Amino acid sequence: MGKDTIADIITSIRNADMNRKRTVQIPFTNITENTVKILLREGFIENVRKHRESDKSFLVLTLRYRRNTKGSYKTFLNLKRISTPGLRIYYNYQKIPRILGGMGIVILSTSRGIMTDREARLEKIGGEVLCYIW
């Protein structure tokens, strides 16, 4: 069986977020790099660094926390893996769901690369739904 890198990213971020860790390390692949770039662009992650130890590369993510009078609270509300290696889920651009009326994002793998639901609707292309973030 192959490894599900998207599920690994989601689980690592969710676990670090629940434990109030400031940074998390994930293995480097092209899919993880493109997914993390989307998270950085959308404001869910504060910083990303590529790090190399001996022959292995990985990304170090700095999670973003907001401050209020009662202390810090998390930016991620929920992350959910949709399409799995055993059950692929595809949508055309008209059927891509809107998460919380557009407040959340859907990350898609399309023929033009990994992108958000808004970008896919603008370019009028569909693809495999990787995950929901809201």
From Swiss-Prot:
<comment type="similarity">
    <text>Belongs to the universal ribosomal protein uS8 family.</text>
</comment>
<dbReference type="GO" id="GO:0005840">
    <property type="term" value="C:ribosome"/>
</dbReference>
<dbReference type="InterPro" id="IPR047863">
    <property type="entry name" value="Ribosomal_uS8_CS"/>
</dbReference>
<dbReference type="InterPro" id="IPR035987">
    <property type="entry name" value="Ribosomal_uS8_sf"/>
</dbReference>
<keyword id="KW-0150">Chloroplast</keyword>
<keyword id="KW-0687">Ribonucleoprotein</keyword>
<comment type="subunit">
    <text>Part of the 30S ribosomal subunit.</text>
</comment>
<dbReference type="GO" id="GO:0006412">
    <property type="term" value="P:translation"/>
</dbReference>
<dbReference type="GO" id="GO:0019843">
    <property type="term" value="F:rRNA binding"/>
</dbReference>
<keyword id="KW-0699">rRNA-binding</keyword>
<dbReference type="GO" id="GO:1990904">
    <property type="term" value="C:ribonucleoprotein complex"/>
</dbReference>
<dbReference type="Pfam" id="PF00410">
    <property type="entry name" value="Ribosomal_S8"/>
</dbReference>
<dbReference type="GO" id="GO:0009507">
    <property type="term" value="C:chloroplast"/>
</dbReference>
<protein>
    <recommendedName>
        <fullName>Small ribosomal subunit protein uS8c</fullName>
    </recommendedName>
</protein>
<keyword id="KW-0689">Ribosomal protein</keyword>
<comment type="function">
    <text>One of the primary rRNA binding proteins, it binds directly to 16S rRNA central domain where it helps coordinate assembly of the platform of the 30S subunit.</text>
</comment>
<keyword id="KW-0694">RNA-binding</keyword>
<dbReference type="InterPro" id="IPR000630">
    <property type="entry name" value="Ribosomal_uS8"/>
</dbReference>
<keyword id="KW-0934">Plastid</keyword>
<dbReference type="GO" id="GO:0003735">
    <property type="term" value="F:structural constituent of ribosome"/>
</dbReference>
